[in-house]
Amino acid sequence: ETAAREGVFDPLFATTDKFNFEVVTLYTSGARHIYTNKPITKPEDLKGYKIRVQDSDTYIQMINLMGGVGIAMGQSEVYAAVQQHVIEGGENSEVVYNNFKHYEIAPYFSYTNHLVMTDVVVANKDFLDDMDEDTRATFRKLMKESMEVEFAAWDQNIEDAKAVLDEHGVTFVKADIEAFRERCMPLLESIANRSDMTREVYDKVQEIKAREA
């Protein structure tokens, strides 16, 4: 959140002009964590565990590095797949975990914090160019301000979901986040080194993380 507020991603977003759209703000969809039929506190706990991920080679590689086996699967298939022992669990935020009632088949929610998700809000450049200068400036200002509103709303969504999950007897587990991060460093470094710009953005995010630790 701090990185978004401080404009760390702005140089990256400026590259979208050539594609005729502009990034007008960033929203959050929270951090993602592992949920299964047992506590997951360290990479060794995931050994042999098949974890549902989105259909992405990067996501599959991430779970594999974390110690498990990444399985690409549609979200709507997860409940039955866990019930039938096709997979052992999934990874997502408390909100999605609650909405799909996955606590019924995977009652241990382990805070691995392996991904922090952002939603990028974009506007077509033609749409923006059709506005007069004052209207365009107001639009951009309000979109930036809406980020704080969305962040606060998401935090409330998390608290509301956790309250429901508590009622259903979910066990929240503290995981060794650093141990999982160490396992994923080869992937992180490969993504960071895709260009000078991504390297700079990654390093600035790490500086903020160290500052807030």
Predicted features by range, described:
Residues 1-7:
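Extracytoplasmic "Venus flytrap"/periplasmic binding protein-like
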Residues 9-10, 14-213:
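N-terminal secretory/targeting leader peptides
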